[in-house]
Regions:
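Sec-dependent N-terminal signal peptides
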Residues: 3-13
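Bacterial extracytoplasmic/cell-wall-associated proteins, especially those involved in peptidoglycan
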Residues: 12, 18-186
């Protein structure tokens, strides 16, 4: 995930001002958690962002998923870029991209930019997006530091129930509905 400077500055300023920080700051992990909350629940109230972040943390704690926030969010099949394929390059110099619509969180492999567009093309700040991003960062920091009420129990899944009903949802139990998302566990 590429971090833009305005998004990074918001992350840095908020993380340094939160009272009661209990863990060392891992900006990359917090950024991944905040980006997921932003893209999955940006138009929802604060509790929606908290709930989405809690699902990610539940997955990190589970033996069924990777044990880092960024790995949970980016989990799924990847393919090598045509720009590096077939060339004699070491693995670390090759570029890989998620396969469209085949990852755990739809925004990560939808084919659109994953940059937080705080700055407009004219250079001015888009305050609506900036405020949604600030809420997402704040939610991520609180959840990362376990400073929130548990809204989702042990849920490791959710979906936007007003838009889709995935096949896997029929095999799971519903824990709660928060705004546009239905939170599930098995």
């Amino acid at each position: 995930m590429e971090i833009t400077l305005p998004a990074l500055l918001v992350l840095f300023n908020i993380s340094n001002s939160v009272v009661g920080y209990t863990q060392p700051v891992n900006y990359n992990e917090i950024y991944c958690l905040a980006a997921n909350s932003y893209f999955e629940a940006r138009g929802e109230p604060f509790d929606g962002k908290i709930a989405v972040a809690q699902v990610v943390m539940n997955r990190v704690k589970s033996k069924d998923y990777p044990n880092s926030i960024c790995e949970v969010i980016t989990e799924g099949p990847h393919r090598e870029s045509w720009k590096t394929r077939g060339k004699e390059l070491p693995k670390e110099e090759r570029q890989y991209y998620p396969i469209k619509h085949r990852c755990q969180f739809s925004w990560y492999c939808d084919g659109y930019s994953d940059k937080i567009p705080i700055k407009r093309k004219d250079g001015n700040i888009n305050t609506v997006i900036e405020n949604m991003w600030k809420d997402s960062v704040y939610a991520a920091i609180l959840v990362y530091n376990n400073r929130t009420k548990n809204l989702v129990g042990t849920s490791e899944f959710y979906y936007a129930h007003e838009k889709v009903t995935p096949d896997w949802a029929e095999k799971m139990d519903e824990y709660v509905i928060i705004e546009g998302h239905r939170f599930m566990y098995d």
